[in-house]
Regions:
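Alpha-helical transmembrane helix bundles of large polytopic membrane transport and channel proteins
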Residues: 1-52
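Core alpha-helical transmembrane segments of integral membrane proteins
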Residues: 65-167
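Transmembrane helix-loop junctions at the membrane interface of multipass transporters and ion channels
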Residues: 222-249, 432-438, 457-475
Length: 511
């Protein structure tokens, strides 16, 4: 077979025509060629094959609205807002409040009474009641909110809507250098980051796959929901009003999506991540009424993983947290301390706190809570619950919320804390999965460093610039925040020097 040989001028002309065609049709060349083939086939069939005129199905009529290029994304954002609003406020908050204020307290009282009746020591009673039950109970209390969230997400997945969102978002993601294939792991990530990272195997191009692995955990997973609910549903709800609580939860989901897009734009303009996104072709299934059995099974599978982690990793974490917050040095002796400011966890937090001071939460309590989040994100809530219960009445949610609110001088500080723990490195299990999927020590450590530096920079800008706008606060770190903002804007809007670079996969896709 003879090959066509083109000179440099012909190649330049063809390349220019290709770019003009992609701009005019608002699509990539592979998709344009594929669409042209199907259009031509349809044209031939229409003149040679006779068949009754097909009527639009109900699915087709719905798709004309929910996959519309103008209405598709606003409808998706509205649906996700309603899902998170209902899950974290309204019904979710009512059940969670009952769990925290009645169920967990009743268990603490019953266990405490039983231990007293059998003559258990005060130390053992404190470990079990305050450390384990108090810490794990602080997380278990948010299980109803998680169950409601998983219920809504499972219904949307089973009815066929979620798969269409990947199709709708393909146009948006392609503009930012990714394809709709990268959005599928993000959808999965709303349940758990581990399967989201593993879902990146379906992405053929290595650079897009690495980028998706690095950013998939930016989407709030089920483990992060208690953290969002704590700061939004408890602190904002008890202290600042339920209006703020209802806004924070869905806002964090949108923050995660925006964080993914911003990171994608910046990284795609660097050589290691450059190249065009792979074409995204998928078959949309018919809409159908969700199966109650399937939906409930999905909810249970997601919730079971959370409960198992609460009964294993969190129990150990709560014991360690209780020990570190109960023991320390007072005077020259080591032992149980009455003031947690003299505890071991306070010493560790105080040592690291200056690093986080520019973010607005430079106190040992919030820093210690963030550090425990690297073992499991739910441990943040456990730590905050244990530390808040020491200073206040653990049976009074208002006192606990007020105690935690004192750790954050302003609302911007609490928001900064929330965003940092949303975007920083995930839990140890997800980190282990990242290492396995990247299969390269260099890329693994780059991913870890990028996630934490990125989270730090975003939180720094949120707190410093937000404080300047709302409170008129200005200082050295405000200047640093504007420098970081200027650098990110430069990376976002500079021309892409590697836009037309072709990238080939060097790794086969595993089933």
């Amino acid at each position: 077979m003879n090959h066509i040989v083109l000179d440099a001028q012909a190649k330049t002309t063809i390349d220019a025509l290709r770019k003009d065609l992609e701009t005019e049709l608002d699509d990539d060349m592979e998709s344009i060629v594929t669409d042209g083939r199907y259009t031509y086939i349809q044209k031939i069939i229409s003149t040679t094959v006779e068949k009754p005129k097909e009527k639009l199905t109900i699915s087709d009529k719905i798709d004309k609205i929910v996959t519309n290029r103008f209405l598709g994304i606003p409808i998706f954002l509205l649906i996700m807002y309603i899902v998170y609003y209902i899950s974290v406020t309204t019904v979710g908050t009512f059940v969670t409040d009952w769990t925290n204020d009645v169920f967990v307290v009743a268990i603490q009282d019953a266990v405490s009474g039983f231990l007293s009746s059998v003559g258990a020591s005060g130390l053992l009673s404190a470990v079990i009641v305050d450390g384990i039950i108090g810490g794990v109970g602080a997380v278990i209390g948010f299980a109803p909110q998680m169950a409601i969230l998983f219920l809504f997400l499972s219904i949307l997945e089973d009815c066929g809507y979620m798969v269409r969102i990947a199709f709708v978002m393909d146009r948006v993601f392609r503009y930012f250098g990714l394809s709709g294939k990268s959005f599928i792991p993000l959808l999965i990530g709303s349940g758990c980051g581990i399967p989201a990272i593993m879902a990146s195997k379906t992405i053929e191009q290595d650079n897009d796959r690495r980028l998706t692995i690095m950013t998939a955990t930016f989407i709030p997973c089920g483990a992060k929901l208690p953290v969002i609910a704590l700061l939004g549903g408890v602190m904002a709800g008890k202290v600042a009003g339920w209006q703020a609580a209802g806004f924070i939860a869905p806002a964090m989901y949108f923050v995660g999506i925006v964080a993914v897009l911003v990171a994608a734009i910046m990284l795609k303009k660097t050589k290691p991540f450059s190249g065009k996104p792979a074409p995204f072709v998928m078959e949309l299934p018919e809409y159908h009424i969700p199966s109650a059995k399937t939906v409930l099974l999905h909810v249970w599978e997601r919730l079971k993983g959370f409960l198992i982690k609460a009964g294993t990793i969190l129990v150990v974490a709560c014991i360690v947290i209780w020990f570190l917050s109960t023991f320390g040095f007072e005077g020259r002796s080591f032992g149980m301390v009455e003031d947690t400011a003299n505890s071991l966890i306070a010493a560790i937090g105080d040592f690291i706190a200056p690093i986080f001071a520019p973010l607005g939460f430079g106190n040992w309590q919030s820093v210690a809570s963030s550090l425990t989040g690297f073992s499991a994100k739910e441990a943040i809530v456990s730590t905050m619950g244990v530390l808040a219960n020491v200073a206040g009445d653990p049976e009074d949610a208002v006192n606990v919320a007020a105690g935690e609110a004192k750790w954050f001088p302003t609302g911007m500080a609490a928001l900064s804390f929330l965003i940092f723990n949303l975007l920083d490195s995930p839990c140890l299990a997800a980190i282990s999965t990242m290492a396995s999927e990247l299969n390269d020590r260099k890329w693994f450590w780059f991913a870890i460093v990028f996630q934490n530096v990125y989270a730090y920079c975003i939180s720094l800008m949120v707190y410093q610039i937000g404080s300047l706008v709302l409170y008129g606060t200005f200082g050295f770190w405000t200047v640093v925040a504007f420098i970081v903002l200027a650098f990110m804007l430069f990376m976002l809007f500079r021309p892409d020097p590697y836009k037309d670079q072709k990238v080939y996969s060097t790794r086969s896709v595993e089933a």
